[in-house]
Amino acid sequence: MSYFPWLTIIVVFPISAGSSIFFLPHRGNKVVRWYTICICLLELLLTTYAFCYHFQLDDPLIQLEEDYKWINILDFHWRLGIDGLSIGPTLLTGFITTLATLAAWPVTRDSQLFHFLMLAMYSGQIGSFSSRDLLLFFIMWELELIPVYLLLSMWGGKKRLYSATKFILYTAGGSIFLLMGVPGMGLYGSNEPTLNLETSANRSYPAALEIIFYFGFFIAYAVKSPIIPLHTWLPDTHGEAHYSTCMLLAGILLKMGAYGLVRINMELLPHAHSIFSPWLMIVGTIQIIYAASTSPGQPNFKKRIAYSSVSHMGFTIIGIASITDMGLNGAILQIISHGFIGAALFFLAGTSYDRIGLVYLDEMGGIAIPMPKIFTMFSSFSMASLALPGMSGFFAELVVFFGIITSTKYLLMPKILITFVMAIGMILTPIYSLSMLRQMFYGYKLFNVTNSYFVDSGPRELFVSICIFLPVIGIGIYPDFVLSLSVEKIEAILSNYLHKSFS
């Protein structure tokens, strides 16, 4: 038990400090922007300090643990803790949110509310990754839905209200299943209800009940991840949202579903996970092919990038379904890797849109010469997305491949078939990535457009791009930087899983 409440401060600080934005003097938007960036930087430094000096990498147990009784009648505790599974996504959240606030610099309309909503999302996302109580996990899971809805409906494109409504219907609909499952697990088999994750993990449930719980939780995570066929909100949301919101969606929000799948479904419901994992493997494989095949047909380049996110999340699902330490480590590496790459692609898509005012690829062409910096960064991140060796995407997908091949759960022929289909998906990725680059940056089309605002990337935009590009290269060259965070915890999860599923 931690004596100093590091995690409570880390979770509460963004939203509480963000509340005082409304009391700042109305002297333009610069004060609000700098205040928000300072909060994000301070939060990131605080998180990094706490994890560097108070987190032991070789300890698979929960660390920095805090437990405060909150609502007695429900046995509801403010229970927080960090382990190897959650430290990576938590640091990713801090990094991407800080850069997203810098990316949101051009936002001038209602900037106080805009920046407050971004900070509220920050608290909700870190709270989700560090919760050790099922009800607290659900509250934090829901906390970031309202900010996304408002950010989308107030600062989105022409169809923003349609996209925002679709987003809230899908995510709130999925959360109903989460809400039903949480008290069900808490109340089952005990005179005193408990929502503690550790206590729930040590319980055993009847097979039929475990399958019902698993399926309910899975629907909630399938919407958020997203997993087909519950993915259709994502292209519409990305197509209309402001690019700083897209960075948070692609970089962090989608990863919460995959995290919940391991944290709740695999750790708490191992028998059901053993039954569902072959189906997860099939769904993940179909998802890679389906999204990679659908992406080239999207005329809107933001929707094309959104479908690439759906395809890449298929690798994460397959890694989780492989039930091997290599597959799970690959899934976590893919979560971190795609968090950087997805956020960068949407940021660059947004900066391109700011300049040319076009989203349809058939109207674009020839912007490489007037905007060489944007072209260079867009090309670099597209290469990372198609898993070029030396970049983070390559190693993440390679580790997932080896995870399937070394899995003892599946027979040889299904493993060969799945790896073959995954390989086809990896071949399809360059097709939509490179064709998007060709349509946007090559040719002469836009040279004929009069009064075009052709200004290349400024220092702020270049800084954001380089800040994301460095970890993409760093992880590609030295993936142990990320794998060392989770390897001990993954071993512990698998040993507990195998012990419980065969007992």
UniProtKB/Swiss-Prot annotation:
E.C. number(s) listed in UniProt: 7.1.1.-
Subcellular location(s) per record: Plastid, Chloroplast thylakoid membrane
Main location: plastid
GO molecular function, one term: NADH dehydrogenase (ubiquinone) activity
Gene Ontology CC terms, in alphabetical order: chloroplast thylakoid membrane
Keyword Transmembrane attributed: yes
Keywords per UniProt: Chloroplast, Membrane, NAD, NADP, Plastid, Plastoquinone, Quinone, Thylakoid, Translocase, Transmembrane, Transmembrane helix
Membrane topology type: Multi-pass membrane protein
Record-level GO BP terms: ATP synthesis coupled electron transport; electron transport coupled proton transport
Principal EC category: translocase
Keyword Thylakoid set for record: yes
Short name of any one Pfam family annotated for the protein: Proton_antipo_M
InterPro entries: NADH_Q_OxRdtase_chain4, NADH_Q_OxRdtase_chainM/4, NADH_UbQ_OxRdtase, ND/Mrp_TM
Family listed: Belongs to the complex I subunit 4 family.
Name the record gives this protein: NAD(P)H-quinone oxidoreductase chain 4, chloroplastic
Taxonomic placement: Eukaryota, Viridiplantae, Streptophyta, Embryophyta, Tracheophyta
